[in-house]
């Protein structure tokens, strides 16, 4: 299977990471998920799809 998504606790929940993985798994190129929190101080988790070798 694909490697588990990176995330920065406590900002990114496992649910968010799983949802991102699901979203990205259908992407033909960027099928890996990377999650990070907003460095500006927002508690929001920002997840996006990346090429697997960019992780």
UniProtKB/Swiss-Prot annotation:
Source domain of life is Eukaryota
Q: Which residues form the propeptide?
A: 1-5
Q: What keywords would UniProt list here?
A: Disulfide bond, Ion channel impairing toxin, Neurotoxin, Secreted, Toxin
Give the tissue specificity: Expressed by the venom duct.
Q: Where does this protein reside within or beyond the cell?
A: Secreted
How would you describe the post-translational modification of this protein?
A: Contains 4 disulfide bonds.
What cellular-component terms does GO give this entry?
extracellular region
Present the record's domain note.
Answer: The cysteine framework is XXII (C-C-C-C-C-C-C-C).
Query: What is known about what this protein does?
Result: Probable neurotoxin with unknown target. Possibly targets ion channels.
Query: What name does UniProt use for this protein?
Result: Conotoxin Cal22c
